[in-house]
Amino acid sequence: MADMKTGIFAKNVQKRLNRAQEKVLQKLGKADETKDEQFEEYVQNFKRQEAEGSRLQRELRAYLAAIKGMQDASKKLTESLHEVYEPDWYGREDVKMIGEKCDELWEDFHQKLVDGSLLTLDTYLGQFPDIKTRIAKRSRKLVDYDSARHHLEALQSSKRKDEGRITKAEEEFQKAQKVFEEFNTDLQEELPSLWSRRVGFYVNTFKNVSSLEAKFHKEIALLCHKLYEVMTKLGDQHADKAFTIQGAPSDSGPLRIAKTPSPPEEVSPLPSPTASPNHMLAPASPAPARPKSPTQLRKGPPVPPLPKLTPTKELQQENIINLFDDNFVPEINVTTPSQNEIPETKKVESLLDLDFDPFKPEVVSTGVTHSPMSQTLPWDLWTTTSELVQPASSTAFNGFAQDTTAFAVQSNENVTETLTEAEEAPLGELKVEETPTAAVVEKEAILAEPDEPTEQAAESIEAGDKETTGIAEKESEVVSAAGGAVAVEDSVVVAAGAGEGAVRTEQEAAAEGDKPQGEEKDVDVSQEKVSSIPSVVIEPASNNEGEGEEHHVIMNESKDAAAEMGTQGTDSETSQIGSEQKATEEIQTTPSQDQPASAGDTASDMPPGFLFKVEVLHDFEAANSDELNLKRGDIVLVIPSETTADQEAGWLTGIKESEWLQYRDANSYKGLFPENFTRHLE
């Protein structure tokens, strides 16, 4: 018995050695290898089929586990409802019965899925291990076949032929070939059949799953409807104890889409900077989202973001000294465009109250003054451009005169004399220059009667604003007069003590001497109504980008301020319009000559039906062919819209100025764009 076991063991070891030797020879290329490419393809399909079936089995078990979890959760939910149900409430027994039936449905659904799908899938996958074993055994028999064949060939090709050994080798070769052919034939028939049957198995499995799930949902929907009816009757029984949630959506009808844009919640403007700190940071809002096109029931365009506000760091040396005083009380009186002004109150502040950020970069002063009207502009005209808000020119801070005008060319001696006179003069005796007031009255006339000469005068004023710096180096007298006009364009806010702060030329003194004394008093009184002394000026946080847009924003603000202030004027101020307008036109004659075209020529070059210009504040990407692709800083010429629905929804029709100047075709290049992505220029 022991000898028999030893013989079998030795025989198996010999087979393993022969197979290993044959594989080594085949790897080294010293022995050829029998290959069946078609069978190898069958093996690859078998491996793929086994992997797909294993994954399907794994996911189906996870699905069944989820069903079991839903069964437990549903059971606990109905049990908790039954526990809180009062005995005198309607449908107590019905609720209990519905819960029990729901649990039975979940259990039946789970069991049928296990019997009809999971067990079938397990049976389907059960045949793969056996086939896999037979494939491995066939591979070993193929090696034995190659080994026997090589051994027989070696004996037949040897010089010394041994017929006995050759005969024995032939018998072994035939035996190995027979065993290999048996495995190979069976697998050649079974593997393709198994691969083709996978389609029918998938169909039957998922048909069973879908039918069971549909039946389950249909039956449990009836129970849910019964529970809904019980709850409805319970609510009718206790109608006086109804519980409503404010703001909860109702299912009484479809949702209504509003076409008009809803403005954001505006922060109420501060009555005065002393009422609350004027150096607080405004909350930043995200970039506006792209609105929908008008063909898709577009709503109003979104709200542009609010500008960030930071305190200015450009304080004079005298102001810094006063800040460290224990009794530092800044007298702030910011004039708003509204007529109902709230009387200012004084608030004791210290340097610790100011929110200075030492990590913000220093901003170079540009000499441009913003009107405080920009703090109370409507929400759809706010911008996030890097326009700098500087202290008002020719203003006084705590009684000390400041000269911040960048357009007047003065020597060091003149500046010293001016500061000395401002310090010695009493605050009540200081007068305001008449040039800003006259320019404001002139703007009132321009808004009231927009004829062609007046528009040319406005174009001349804008041209003078751009070229005053270059002319100031050549003709100081013309520069001084133009600086007064530019001060009006830059800001409507004029300090009460700013009149003596600027050096007047001989021409201005002569012009003032010709005016009646009564008119001069009226101008002083009306100018004092809008004067202010801002001590802490806020500016938008920026990186000095978009400074080229300053001029347009300032012109827009000053025109709005002039329209508000013009209603408070007297008849005596209106009588000065003619003389002041002529003086302004004479002052601006030199820079206006350099303009390439007049306002009349520009109007003739506009597209048909031109209304006004707007500047794009945010990038807008068109979603439809009837919309414009806009980038920040583009100028758009607005023309009448074809439908009023677009205007009501907050959309405008226009053509980009660059495309109009290049193609002169409004019909081909016009398109829609959101109005609150832009601001008006004229």
Swiss-Prot record:
| Species of the source | Gallus gallus
List the residue ranges forming a coiled coil, or say none.
Answer: 10-84, 144-191
Where does the entry say this protein is expressed, by tissue? Is abundant in the forebrain and cerebellum. It is also found in the adrenal gland, anterior and posterior pituitary.
Keyword Cytoplasm assigned to the entry: answer is: yes
Q: What is this protein called?
A: Amphiphysin
Ranges of Polar residues composition bias in the record = 567-596
The gene for this chain is AMPH
**SUPFAM superfamilies given in the database record:** BAR/IMD domain-like, SH3-domain
- Biological process, per Gene Ontology: synaptic vesicle endocytosis
PANTHER family from the xrefs? AMPHIPHYSIN
Instruction: List the biased-composition ranges (Basic and acidic residues).
Output: 503-527
**Which superkingdom is the protein from?**
Eukaryota
Where would I find the SH3 domain in this sequence? 609-682
Which segments constitute the BAR domain?
24-240
Q: Does the keyword Cell membrane apply?
A: no
Matching InterPro entries, A to Z? AH/BAR_dom_sf, Amphiphysin, Amphiphysin_1, Amphiphysin_I_SH3, BAR_dom, SH3-like_dom_sf, SH3_domain
For the region Disordered, give the residue spans.
Answer: 244-310, 446-470, 501-530, 561-606
